[in-house]
Amino acid sequence: MATTSIAGPRLTSLKTAAGKLGYREICHVRQWAPVHSPMPHFGMLRCGSRRPFATSSSTVVQAQAQATAAEQSTGEEEAVPKVESPVVVVTGASRGIGKAIALSLGKAGCKVLVNYARSAKEAEQVSKQIEAYGGQAITFGGDVSKEADVDAMMKTAVDAWGTIDVVVNNAGITRDTLLIRMKKSQWDEVIDLNLTGVFLCTQAATKIMMKKRKGRIINIASVVGLIGNIGQANYAAAKAGVIGFSKTAAREGASRNINVNVVCPGFIASDMTAKLGEDMEKKILGTIPLGRYGQPEDVAGLVEFLALSPAASYITGQAFTIDGGIAI
């Protein structure tokens, strides 16, 4: 298998066996051809009875006709094309929750575009893990708060795989400080990436999904968007905005069979929580009824259900908390 590398937001072109794909972002593309096992042919039919039976010419003709029909039926079944793997775009997928989501969907058989802003090496490792599962992945560097980057990202997925079935908007940052000390630049940074980025990605994906009258969008917000948190006025505002925005997007997309839902994590184990002192951790865990941190895989499991399960086809416009009970 050959791997073709392309570079970040200054692109060149991507060569594949099918030809050339041109775009302006840098990415790394890997594709594993799925293994197709043809259905086995049935051999001669055997009668389970040992009793002798008479055979007439009409019976022989009838049996031959049935055998021919069975062979044709088997051939038709073999000719049925394999269901295509869903194409998924996951933003902020180089680490933490985004990484867990990308790996979960890749393991489930999806073709995954792994978006990152600065962590190219980590994103590349995520793609390699997806490939190890037998999947396909594109690693794409881009800032989701910039419209040109978002358009190039969506084009990359469509050029590589023909469509986009699922988008998971996970990219986000924090710039924590008390409200009275918060600089406008700290406010703007968080709103631009955490809210405007979701708007741009959802808008771009919806245009593609509306044409095929099908799609699923999962936006990662936070329990902070529901209950607030000291020192996170900017973050809480952005995540509350994501929830309201997603409900409107769900109403507008419903007529085209586009489901839009929100996942609101609470305290999830991360590099940051690992560095907290014992006293701080004790205080945090005291606010969680289940008394422990969630794991990135907990969030990924819920996202996978909303993204892929037929049982989630009638769910839209909902905000799901996965927080150990903080928002009860």
UniProtKB/Swiss-Prot annotation:
Q: Which pathway features in its UniProt record?
A: Lipid metabolism; fatty acid biosynthesis
Alphabetized UniProt keyword annotations = Chloroplast, Fatty acid biosynthesis, Fatty acid metabolism, Lipid biosynthesis, Lipid metabolism, NADP, Oxidoreductase, Plastid, Transit peptide
Which positions form the organelle transit peptide?
1-66
Q: How does it assemble?
A: Homotetramer.
Question: To which protein family does this belong?
Answer: Belongs to the short-chain dehydrogenases/reductases (SDR) family.
Q: Name one GO molecular function term.
A: 3-oxoacyl-[acyl-carrier-protein] reductase (NADPH) activity
Which GO BP terms sit in this record?
Answer: fatty acid biosynthetic process
Q: Which domain of life is it from?
A: Eukaryota
NCBIfam families in the record:
3oxo_ACP_reduc, PRK07231.1, PRK12826.1-2
Catalytic positions are Y235 (proton acceptor)
Provide the residue positions that the database annotates as binding NADP(+): 90-114
* Group of enzyme by EC: oxidoreductase
Q: Which PROSITE patterns match?
A: ADH_SHORT
Gene3D superfamilies attached to this UniProt entry: NAD(P)-binding Rossmann-like Domain
Gene name tied to this protein: bkr2
User: Which SUPFAM superfamilies does the record cross-reference, listed alphabetically?
Assistant: NAD(P)-binding Rossmann-fold domains
Q: Which reaction is recorded as catalysed by this protein? A: a (3R)-hydroxyacyl-[ACP] + NADP(+) = a 3-oxoacyl-[ACP] + NADPH + H(+)
E.C. number(s) listed in UniProt: 1.1.1.100
Pfam family of the protein (one): adh_short
According to its UniProt record, where is this protein located? Plastid, Chloroplast; Plastid
Residue ranges crossing the lipid bilayer per the database entry: none
**A cellular component annotation (GO) from this entry:** chloroplast
**UniProt keyword annotation of Chloroplast present:** yes
What species is given as this protein's source? Brassica napus (Rape)
- Protein name listed in UniProt: 3-oxoacyl-[acyl-carrier-protein] reductase 2, chloroplastic
